[in-house]
Amino acid sequence: MFGKGGMGNLMKQAQQMQERMQKLQEEIANMEVVGESGAGLVKVTITGSHSVRRVNIDESLMEDDKEMLEDLIAAAFNDAARRVEETQKEKMAAITGGMQLPPGMKMPF
């Protein structure tokens, strides 16, 4: 079924991909992504593992109502989370040669 050394070569490639995936998972967990809302008046910085590092709120919003500010913070966080997901997909595609993960399977595993 496999040519000479085919199975061994396949196993070696699988091991190399696994090592690259592990390195990518570490890289993604340590990266920081900024999400924005309100035309940049609220910025949320999160890690690739979705831990919030910073929340920056423009001074002009401190006088506005609390509910609007809460909505802007939530929107900025959601924007940052979306950016993390997009970055993960791009980096994964670079490693897997564009091979898509099965539906429902996400990085990191």
Swiss-Prot record:
Coiled coil: none
A Pfam cross-reference name: YbaB_DNA_bd
Signal sequence segment: none
Region of interest called Disordered, as start-end residue ranges on this chain: 1-22
Key words, A-Z: Cytoplasm, DNA-binding
Localization per record: Cytoplasm, Nucleoid
GO molecular function: DNA binding
GO cellular component: bacterial nucleoid; cytosol
InterPro entries: YbaB-like_sf (IPR036894), YbaB/EbfC (IPR004401)
Keyword hit for Cytoplasm: yes
Superkingdom classification of source: Bacteria
Role played: Binds to DNA and alters its conformation. May be involved in regulation of gene expression, nucleoid organization and DNA protection.
Membership in a protein family: Belongs to the YbaB/EbfC family.
UniProt subunit comment: Homodimer.
Name this protein carries in UniProt: Nucleoid-associated protein VV2410
Species this chain originates from: Vibrio vulnificus (strain YJ016)
